[in-house]
């Protein structure tokens, strides 16, 4: 039955993506045609709901259910077990993607029926690809005889895991819908493109923010991190599409018209980063995990770059096909961007729609052939370290059609070669190949090529300042994080600086301070988000074996401070240039003096180092003062915009909601510094040993171990038994509350779950985490001698002042983003469906 339902789901995706009005004869029944996409959308969900039903009834004849299900779990947890199976999220993602293709199936503003049908076809086609990948993973495969019963990962047996993963894949479906909009508009007029993207980006921003926030809340309450954010590769990967959406959301504020090619590039980037985030999550072991995942023989060695490890996964029959499919689509998106740049620079395709209609099958066919021919070579014992040369050739062949498919220059630009295309020679491609082979990271080389191409194909390269800024950031961060050798970083850097190094001195423009202060806040939204994106992505590429927490915090702090400064400048736009400059310079002086004289003022682990010269307190002084000063000014902007007379209700006014989002962001920045930057979670000083009824004082707070509670499995919602310790918490002489951190035992998996408890107060939270390495001895002592026999316990304690700012800020951002999405309702100008 499962195979039949999967086939039905695939047919449903096809019903959504096909342009029925063009395929069926003119005399076909109109009502029938209109219902076919709706029928397809419904059918696309059937495989997912059947898998959910199998988990709900605990059908152990299905291998996935036998591995992760459980009749004793609450109903919602059995539903959540669906996305613990590898195929479950794919079916969920396919359903969301097909639903969005169906929802926006009519031509949008400025979109012709032909372009709309291509957009819907691209999105529906990706849903079909996901369905095919799910078929390959066999979600309804029968349980083999003798297979032992498994158990859902204890960390997933929580309420938040019921809603967090579906929201993540819904967000990624939105990102792919935006990418399909960008692809379908290549070679077409730019009229209405920004409106079409914005209509989709605003709800995508809401869903992505909600998904990431709930993931952070899950980490805060369930994981033993003692915080909501740790720059873990999976959460960092999901942060990248959010940053791309931030770039799109601020496209309207840029103080000049954004070219269509840039909008399409940002749209493609959004979809590509959703795929990359999925790669980080599902390319098991590639990021910050055991490298043994990729070793297939004793004499083999794992590749030391992300791309090499992903390609090495091709040997895995289940994960390999899925991961390679995502990688291929990622490269195809990069190819479309390169083609669009060539078209914008004056080259032309023959025929025009060759770019969209034939690019994908040609590129995928070539890539599959090369992947088939090189996979066997790259995974042979002893040669895993030589993946990069094969990978470079593979990627080169995948992207090669992008270089040649656009034909010849148009007559009006013939003879005007691009900056890095002397006599038509693609020097930029040659440099990218050198970066891949010398630096050893093919993904980094592809990103470099995508950033440099706007300069390479342009006959006026100095007009591409944003691309140059992003490229310089990419090169510098690659050097700082030792992702590539220094000489390779130099090879990456010089081409971005070359146009300005070659420029005449008298061609340098004069700087107008007044105009700069006026325009800078308008550029900041998109610009800072883009710089943060490049920074985060580059550090993540280097985090395959360890998390570079310090790099994220130190380098990102400059951009966080710039964000606060830009919002403050915008709030002071009615003031004179002197007032604004005085405010900024004064804040910089306060930060500098404070960092030099009193870096430990902020408390916590402010005096702990993030590098040889940078303390955590230095970061706090750089970021927090400007953010604190900006908060009241931005809230005043909210009130000012809401009180302004208008026929539009205040809750549907874009300025009001945008200022609410910005106010929430500032609070979130302050909360992040206080609860993440200033807390050294690797410091053993946070682990304290408490003797029974003897208070232990740490940083002015007192913790007293009172009792031990042993909880049998029948009294638990999930788990086979638990041990909790009762601890009184007080601030000096004032009692703050009682915490009961502990550990829950899961016998089937043998995997204990740490139970975090939080004591909340007006000034912030105190997080207490039970050290479960003592759990076995403690349980045995209680069982044999009674609870009174336990006279000491170990607990990790993190005090997080101003932690409420994180959640209040997140809530305000969601509130404002929802208002922005509602302000777009009714503005979609649809034409009859294609």
Where does each model-flagged region fall?
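Interfacial helix-loop-helix junctions of multi-pass membrane proteins
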Residues: 214-235, 286-291
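Transmembrane alpha-helix boundary signature
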Residues: 48-67, 75, 81, 103-117, ...
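Transmembrane helix-loop-helix hairpins at membrane boundaries of multipass inner-membrane proteins
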Residues: 23-88, 117-157, 218, 289-291
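Contiguous transmembrane helix-bundle modules in multi-pass membrane proteins
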Residues: 1-24, 36-39, 46, 60-62, ...
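A conserved hydrophobic secondary-structure block that centers on an alpha-helix together
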Residues: 89-90, 96-143, 147-216
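Transmembrane-helix bundle segments that line or gate the permeation/cavity pathway
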Residues: 44-67, 71, 80-101, 135-141, ...
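Extracytosolic and intramembrane catalytic regions of membrane-associated proteins
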Residues: 697-802, 812
């Amino acid at each position: 039955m499962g195979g039949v339902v999967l086939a039905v789901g695939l047919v449903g995706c096809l019903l959504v993506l096909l342009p029925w009005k063009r395929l069926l004869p003119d005399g076909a029944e109109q009502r029938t045609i209109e219902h076919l996409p709706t029928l397809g959308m419904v059918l696309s969900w059937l495989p997912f709901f059947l898998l959910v039903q199998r988990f709900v009834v605990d059908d152990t004849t299905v291998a996935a259910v036998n591995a992760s299900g459980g009749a004793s779990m609450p109903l919602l947890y059995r539903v959540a077990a669906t996305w613990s199976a590898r195929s479950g999220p794919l079916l969920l993602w396919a359903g969301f993607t097909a639903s969005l293709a169906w929802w926006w199936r009519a031509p949008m503003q400025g979109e012709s029926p032909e372009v709309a049908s291509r957009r819907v076809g691209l999105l529906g086609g990706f849903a079909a690809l996901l369905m095919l990948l799910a078929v390959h993973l066999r979600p309804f495969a029968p349980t083999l005889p003798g297979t032992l019963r498994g158990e859902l990962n204890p960390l997933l047996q929580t309420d938040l895991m019921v809603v967090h993963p579906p929201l993540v894949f819904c967000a990624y479906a939105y990102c792919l819908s935006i990418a399909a909009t960008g692809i379908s508009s290549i070679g077409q007029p730019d009229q209405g493109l920004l409106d079409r993207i914005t209509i989709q980006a605003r709800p995508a921003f809401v869903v992505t923010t909600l998904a990431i926030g709930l993931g952070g809340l899950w980490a805060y309450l369930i994981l033993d991190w003692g915080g909501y954010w740790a720059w873990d590769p999976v959460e960092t990967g999901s942060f990248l599409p959010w940053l791309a959406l931030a770039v799109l959301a601020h496209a309207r504020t840029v103080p000049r018209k954004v070219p269509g090619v840039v909008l399409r590039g940002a749209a493609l980037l959004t979809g590509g980063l959703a795929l990359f985030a999925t790669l980080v999550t599902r390319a098991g072991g590639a990021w910050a995990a055991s490298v043994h995942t990729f070793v297939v023989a004793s004499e083999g060695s794992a590749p030391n770059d992300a791309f090499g490890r992903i390609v090495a996964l091709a040997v895995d029959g289940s994960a390999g096909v899925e991961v390679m499919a995502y990688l291929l689509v990622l490269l195809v998106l990069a190819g479309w961007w390169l083609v669009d740049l060539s078209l914008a620079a004056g080259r032309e395709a023959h025929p025009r729609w060759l770019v969209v209609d034939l690019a994908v099958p040609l590129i995928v066919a070539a890539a599959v052939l090369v992947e088939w021919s090189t996979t066997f070579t790259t995974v042979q014992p002893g040669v895993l370290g030589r993946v990069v040369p094969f990978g470079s050739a593979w990627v080169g062949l995948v992207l090669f059609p992008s270089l040649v498919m656009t034909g010849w220059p148009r007559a009006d630009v013939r003879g005007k070669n691009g900056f890095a295309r002397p006599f038509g020679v693609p020097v930029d491609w040659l440099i990218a190949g050198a970066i891949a082979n010398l630096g050893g990271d093919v993904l980094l080389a592809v990103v470099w090529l995508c950033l440099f191409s706007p300069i390479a194909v342009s006959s006026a390269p100095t007009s591409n300042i944003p691309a140059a800024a992003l490229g310089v950031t990419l090169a510098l961060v690659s050097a700082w994080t030792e992702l590539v050798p220094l000489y390779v970083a130099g090879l990456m850097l010089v081409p971005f600086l070359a146009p300005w190094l070659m420029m005449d001195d008298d061609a340098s423009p004069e700087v107008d301070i007044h105009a700069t202060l006026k325009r800078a806040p308008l550029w900041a939204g998109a610009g800072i988000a883009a710089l943060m994106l490049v920074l985060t992505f580059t550090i993540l590429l280097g985090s395959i074996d360890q998390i570079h927490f310090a790099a994220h915090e130190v380098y990102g702090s400059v951009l966080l401070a710039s964000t606060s400064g830009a919002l403050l400048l915008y709030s002071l736009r009615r003031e004179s240039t002197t007032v604004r400059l005085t405010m900024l310079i004064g804040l910089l002086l306060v930060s500098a003096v404070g960092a030099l004289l009193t870096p430990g003022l902020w408390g916590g682990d402010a005096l702990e180092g993030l590098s040889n010269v940078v303390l955590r307190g230095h970061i706090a002084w750089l970021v927090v003062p400007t953010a604190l000063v900006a908060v009241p000014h931005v809230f005043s902007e909210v009130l000012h915009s809401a009180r302004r007379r208008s026929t539009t209700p205040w809750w549907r006014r874009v300025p009001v909601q945008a200022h609410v989002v910005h106010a929430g962001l500032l609070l979130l920045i302050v909360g992040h510094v206080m609860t993440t930057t200033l807390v050294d979670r690797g410091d053993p000083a946070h682990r304290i040993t408490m003797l029974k009824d003897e208070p232990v004082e740490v940083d002015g707070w007192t913790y007293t171990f009172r009792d031990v509670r042993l909880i049998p499995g029948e009294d638990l919602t999930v788990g086979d038994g638990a041990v909790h310790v009762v601890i009184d918490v007080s601030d000096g002489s004032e009692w703050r509350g009682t915490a009961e951190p502990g550990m829950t035992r899961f016998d089937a998996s043998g995997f204990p779950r740490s139970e975090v408890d939080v004591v909340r107060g007006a000034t912030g939270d105190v997080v207490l985490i039970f050290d479960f390495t003592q759990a076995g001895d403690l349980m045995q002592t209680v069982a044999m001698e009674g609870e009174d026999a336990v006279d000491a316990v170990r607990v990790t304690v993190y005090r997080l002042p101003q932690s409420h700012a994180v959640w209040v800020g997140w809530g305000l951002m969601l509130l404002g983003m929802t208002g922005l999405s509602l302000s777009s309702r009714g503005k979609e100008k649809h034409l009859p469906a294609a």
